[in-house]
Curated annotation (Swiss-Prot):
This is Homeobox-leucine zipper protein HAT14. GO terms for cellular component: nucleus. The gene is HAT14. Residues 187-246 bind DNA. Pfam families: HALZ, Homeodomain. Probable transcription factor.
Amino acid sequence: MELALSLGDNTKKQFSFMEKNSKINNPSVSSTSTSEKDLGFCMALDVAFGGHRSLSSSSSPSVEDEKKKPAPRAKKSDEFRVSSSVDPPLQLQLHFPNWLPENSKGRQGGRMPLGAATVVEEEEEEEEAVPSMSVSPPDSVTSSFQLDFGIKSYGYERRSNKRDIDDEVERSASRASNEDNDDENGSTRKKLRLSKDQSAFLEDSFKEHSTLNPKQKIALAKQLNLRPRQVEVWFQNRRARTKLKQTEVDCEYLKRCCESLTEENRRLQKEVKELRTLKTSTPFYMQLPATTLTMCPSCERVATSAAQPSTSAAHNLCLSTSSLIPVKPRPAKQVS
């Protein structure tokens, strides 16, 4: 990135961020040079990548000298670098106002020229004009501030391609080793093929005893023309199948028990709900008061049992047959 600054003249001088110390040590030279120039102000900003530009304090040569110089040939090392942008650099032009005194406008007919545009040329031409501030020699293409994206990206691609190739080789080797292992296992571990007679004899032996001692195993292997290891493996598999079947039967039994318990629980919950409903609802029958005297409406008089036995009998019959209505008790009449 460069920052070019000019004051009103047509010279294409650029001022970068890293100025020489000579300009700072000799302020008189800079003051005299600026006094002879117009008060125009121009600032240019240039950004370049790859091997085209680098940060260095340099003053560009004149346009005529640059046109006379032959174009430098691109080096082989620059083939992978990103080409720099063709767009012109950004420029900022500032003019002084008209209220300044006329003697400060310069010596060019009282007119202040516009800011001179800085032209960015090739790096080799710039470095030949003014030496760079970097550690590398002036005519070198690269510097410490150069951003070389092309070579970095190319190197990254090469490393990634190499890594992919190595991974592919490892995967192919692992597949080959797995296939070899499978072939070896297949040759050594073949499935045992038994005839019907051998299977029936082994089944009968398993019903008698599910486990075999070494002597029984050897005798059974000789009788069936098999190896002792094959007989042992058959018994192990038969015990595993028996255990699996028993486990399946137990699971089915537990499943049925769980279903029956679920149905019973649902029925009990339904009964509890019905009982709670009956408890909270009103009763269907009417309760009679405890301390009331009931009397038949046809019997208005109460007589003693000795005086009128027939009347009391009729009264009792009436109480048993007629409807009962609660009435208030009356005092008994005295018979004179």
